[in-house]
Structures are given as C-alpha cells and as structure tokens.
Amino acid sequence: MFLTSRRGVTPGQAGFGYAVFAIAMTLGRLNGDRCVQALGGKRILLFGSLCAAAGLAVAVLVPTPAAALVGFVLVGVGCSNLVPVLYSAAGSQSAMPAGAAISAITTIGYSGILVGPALIGFVAQAATLSIAFMGVATLLLLVARSSHVAVR
C-alpha cells in the first residue's frame, strides 16, 4: 500500500516491497546464529533495531521507489533476529522460571501481531501511512535504548 499510495508504484510492482523485506528477513534469520555468536545478543538487539528504524526512515523520507525498497531490506535485516534474541534472553534469565518468561514474551508478541496492524491503520487513517511508519521507527529506537537491559 505504501509503495502504491506514496511512491507511485503500480500494484503489480508493489509486491517487490514485501518480497525484498521477506528475503532480507529470511537471509538474516538464516545467518542469525553466526551473528549472535560474533556480536552477542545485546549488540544484535541494538544494531538490529537501529537498522530497522533507519530502514523505515529511508523508506519514508527518501521519495523514490528504489529507496523504499532499500529501506524495506534494512527493516528485514534489522528485525530478523530481534525475536530470537529476546526468546533466548527470556529462557536464560533467572528472575522467573524460563517457561513463564517465554510465555510472557509469546503473549506480548501475539498481542503485537493482533494490535499492531490495527494501530498502524488507525494512525495512517488519522494522519498518513508515513507517520505511522515513523511511529514504528520510534518504537524500534526504544528497543535500541533498552537493549542493554533486555539482554545481559
């Protein structure tokens, strides 16, 4: 929708936006273990969330279809290992039983899957899809800010 409404891409070409995001997400996930071993979970959360926020900013602020596609690649790569790192951190922390921690993370994740699209749609309807995307970028910056606490 963003590519057709904001970047003038035809509906037939707009599928490339999701395709490049999904390919980047898949490649990032397949290489995630190596990246986590090399950088550590804390840095993956920090760099991943910053990469995804930057990708959304590029997609929104640079008014070309090519830039939007590059932005979606950055979002895919950046987000690809955030959830696995959070699950790992939940399973290895000692403040609560691992099963309860993983259940809490799962509940939060499913809540986001259910509420997130509706909230993005609400903001897009009230303002613009670009503003909604920048709101998501802001939330990703909060993830970056809290990465030192989320993974110890």
Located regions from the model:
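Intracellular juxtamembrane helix-capping segments at the cytosolic ends
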Residues: S80-S94
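Short hydrophobic/small-residue motifs within alpha-helical transmembrane segments
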Residues: A22-I23, L27, Y110-G112
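A membrane-interface helix-boundary motif in multi-pass transporters
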Residues: G121-L140
